């Protein structure tokens, strides 16, 4: 009887221990659902929502290699032949460069309109001279207001020099500058711009950075329709106290064929930030 009672007590004890272990067992939680990146199609293709925000981001860029030669683009190289007992000599050869461009775009809807940004950084190796890095764009825009690093409105508002090869044969305007600008866009093809700009310390080899609190000023107007468009833009260089202006006419012959004519004028034969060409007319 005592042995039987002992066996039953042991069984009860083991059962109690087993129940306690079951009560203390670690329960493995279900895995958290994975939050995949959401596609944002508000601003076009390639955008996605930054996780945890309503800001859309697009990342892009390109790789470019360019080689050129001839009288307009070739470069002169000096060969050191003194080690061979000769004299230095010069030869002409082609110019070349390789470029990596990294770009970002962001967009967010606010009560005041679309808040957007754009950046572009370029890494370039030219003619074996080492790598150079440049910040070409870094601006913020809210509605029609834009601030930051951009290219001068005097150059961009009229459409640069068109979609042509070697558009820099005749200088037509400045590029790098910090600016504060506002662009008005009407519903009938009319638009206008005003831009306050700081200039650049190195534009076509000259220093046009502002020297006091008076900025350079750009103003322009443009009318665009299906047949083409007309644009006029003027600028005041506050450092040299001179001005320049450009007018451009675009004609679209077909969906793939177009032509334009552009003319520039400055009030002085000397150069200024907005008149990189020699003489008054260009």
Predicted feature descriptions by range:
Residues 47-70, 79-81, 85-201, 211-226:
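Outer membrane beta-barrel
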Residues 70-74, 128-131, 158, 203-205, ...:
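Outer-membrane beta-barrel proteins
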Residues 1-64:
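N-terminal periplasmic/intermembrane-space "pro-region" immediately following the signal or transit peptide
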Residues 75-85, 201-212, 264-281:
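Solvent-exposed loop segments that connect transmembrane elements
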Residues 214, 219-282:
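Detector for outer-membrane/organellar transmembrane beta-barrel domains
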């Amino acid at each position: 009887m005592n042995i039987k009672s002992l066996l039953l007590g042991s069984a009860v004890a083991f059962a109690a221990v087993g129940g306690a272990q079951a009560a203390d067992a670690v329960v493995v939680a279900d895995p958290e659902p994975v939050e995949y990146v959401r596609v944002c199609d508000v601003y076009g293709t390639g955008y996605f929502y930054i996780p945890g925000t309503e800001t859309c981001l697009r990342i892009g860029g390109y790789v470019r290699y360019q080689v050129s030669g001839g009288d307009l683009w070739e470069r002169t190289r000096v060969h050191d032949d003194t080690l061979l007992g000769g004299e230095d000599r010069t030869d002409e050869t082609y110019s070349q460069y390789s470029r990596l461009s990294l770009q970002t775009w962001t967009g967010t809807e606010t009560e005041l309109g679309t808040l957007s940004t754009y950046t572009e950084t370029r890494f370039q190796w030219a003619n074996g001279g080492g790598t150079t890095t440049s910040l070409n764009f870094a601006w913020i825009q809210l509605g029609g207001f834009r601030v930051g690093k951009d290219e001068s409105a005097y150059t961009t508002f009229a459409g640069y020099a068109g979609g042509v090869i070697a558009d820099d044969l005749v200088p037509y305007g400045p590029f790098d500058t910090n600016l504060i600008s506002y662009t008005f866009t009407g519903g009938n093809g009319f638009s206008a711009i005003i831009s306050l700009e700081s200039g650049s310390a190195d534009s076509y080899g000259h220093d046009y950075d502002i020297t006091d609190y008076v900025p350079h000023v750009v103003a322009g107007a443009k009318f665009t329709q299906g047949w083409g468009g007309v644009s006029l833009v003027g600028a005041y260089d506050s450092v040299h106290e001179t001005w320049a202006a450009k007018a451009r006419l675009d004609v679209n012959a077909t969906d793939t064929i177009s032509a334009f004519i552009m003319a520039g004028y400055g009030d002085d034969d000397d150069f200024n930030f907005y008149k990189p060409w020699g003489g008054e007319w260009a």
